[in-house]
Amino acid sequence: MKFFIDTASLEEIQAAKDLGMLDGVTTNPSLIARIVGDASSFSYQDFREHIRRIAEIADGPVSAEVTTTDAEEMIHEGEALAAIHENVVVKCPLTIDGLKAIRHLSEKGIRTNATLVFSPNQALLAAKAGASYVSPFVGRLDDISTEGMALVEQIITIYDNYGYLTEVIVASIRHPRHVVESAMMGADIATIPFSVIRQLANHPLTDAGLKKFMEDAAILKKESDA
C-alpha cells in the first residue's frame, strides 16, 4: 500500500520523504489556509507557487484541489493546475459539475482525484467518469456514527468486480487503526497526516523494552570501564 501525506506543510512533506514514507501528497484549500495563517495576503499565484514547491519535493502524485464549483471553471482551473508540474493531480468534488470536470480532464490526459466521497454510489460514478483516484473520507463518516471503513470495503469490491482502474485513496484518516484496516482491505493508498505517520511507529512495549535495554547497556558500560 502506498503512503501519501495529507498536508500542505513543506517541512512535514520533507520529513516524510526523509523517513522513506512519501509516495505522494494530498492537499486542499483548508490545509493550505492552515499553514498560511493570514490568508488575506496569500494570492492565487502564491497558492500555485506553493503547489509547485510541494511537487518539487515529492516524487509522486500531488493532489491540488480546484477552488470553484462550476464545471467549466473547474476545467479551466484544473488545466492550469496540471500545467504547474507533471506530478500534479487535479482534485474535484464529487458533484454533478465535478463529474463533468473529471470526465473532461481525464479525456485530455490530466489525472484527477474525486474528493469528498461518502458513498459507494459516488465512488462508482467517479470510476465511470474516468477518475484516476477516488478519496473516501472515513474519519468524517465516523464522526456521524457511520462506519467509514465499511465504505472503503464496498468501493474495493465494486472496483474489483468490474476491473476499474481508479485507485482508492483512503482519506480523512484519524488514527493508526484506519491505516492498518486500509492495508488489510487492500486499499491502494492511505493519505495520512504526519502526526499519524509518527504514531504508527509507537508502541508501549517498544518503549518499555528500549528503556530496559538502555538500562542494561549502561550497566555493562560501567562494568567494562571498571
Curated annotation (Swiss-Prot):
Pathway: Carbohydrate degradation; pentose phosphate pathway; D-glyceraldehyde 3-phosphate and beta-D-fructose 6-phosphate from D-ribose 5-phosphate and D-xylulose 5-phosphate (non-oxidative stage): step 2/3
GO molecular function: aldehyde-lyase activity; transaldolase activity
InterPro entries: Aldolase_TIM, TAL/FSA, Transaldolase_3B, Transaldolase_3B/F6P_aldolase, Transaldolase_AS, TSA/FSA_arc/bac
Keywords for this protein: Cytoplasm, Pentose shunt, Schiff base, Transferase
Xref: PROSITE patterns: TRANSALDOLASE_1
SUPFAM superfamilies found in the cross-reference section: Aldolase
Primary location class: cytoplasm
The organism's place on the tree of life at top rank: Bacteria
GO annotation, cellular component aspect: cytoplasm
Cellular localisation: Cytoplasm
GO biological process: carbohydrate metabolic process; pentose-phosphate shunt
Catalytic reactions on record: D-sedoheptulose 7-phosphate + D-glyceraldehyde 3-phosphate = D-erythrose 4-phosphate + beta-D-fructose 6-phosphate
This enzyme's EC code(s): 2.2.1.2
Annotated catalytic residues: 91
Function: Transaldolase is important for the balance of metabolites in the pentose-phosphate pathway.
Family assignment from sequence similarity: Belongs to the transaldolase family. Type 3B subfamily.
Record protein name field: Probable transaldolase
Name of the encoding gene: tal
